[in-house]
Amino acid sequence: MEIQGNRKELMVSKIKNGTVIDHIPAGRAFAVLNVLGIKGHEGFRIALVINVDSKKMGKKDIVKIEDKEISDTEANLITLIAPTATINIVREYEVVKKTKLEVPKVVKGILKCPNPYCITSNDVEAIPTFKTLTEKPLKMRCEYCETIIDENEIMSQILGANNK
């Protein structure tokens, strides 16, 4: 948004139907698209606003995806790389659902323990399970071997899994 005098002007027009993901930490908009599996050839009209000023965050990113409503599963993945994000579902230019993402207390089967000696690395029936220790910065602990992973490891795993 640009402010001229006393009025605000939109940098990007409103979308008729789709999803607006707001309050993404600055520089992570492309990671959000990656998590959603959006490469650019799917036919969705997408707007990215990167490093825009934010009163709450200093700088933030915004992603607008026309004609796509993201699923709960996709929202859960976004939470791990953009825990401050808000997801707005838009229909006929109106926000019909607004969800403030929250880091889950426990994450099962999404992340892998980097410890090669962890039982989850060697037993296919052991489901990797992580408990959130802190949200800022994001740190999680393996429930089996107590290995701690940080935000960088989490992003690396999630983005790596989506590039396969």
UniProtKB/Swiss-Prot annotation:
One of its GO terms (cellular component) is aspartate carbamoyltransferase complex. Binds 1 zinc ion per subunit. Signal peptide: none annotated. It comes from the Archaea. Pfam families: PyrI, PyrI_C. InterPro entries: Asp_carbamoyltransf_reg_N (IPR020545), Asp_carbamoylTrfase_reg (IPR002801), Asp_carbamoyltrfase_reg_C (IPR020542), Asp_carbatrfase_reg_C_sf (IPR036792), Asp_carbatrfase_reg_N_sf (IPR036793). GO terms for molecular function: metal ion binding. Keywords: Metal-binding, Pyrimidine biosynthesis, Zinc. Contains catalytic and regulatory chains. NCBIfam families: ATCase_reg. Belongs to the PyrI family. Involved in allosteric regulation of aspartate carbamoyltransferase. This is Aspartate carbamoyltransferase regulatory chain. It comes from Sulfolobus acidocaldarius (strain ATCC 33909 / DSM 639 / JCM 8929 / NBRC 15157 / NCIMB 11770).
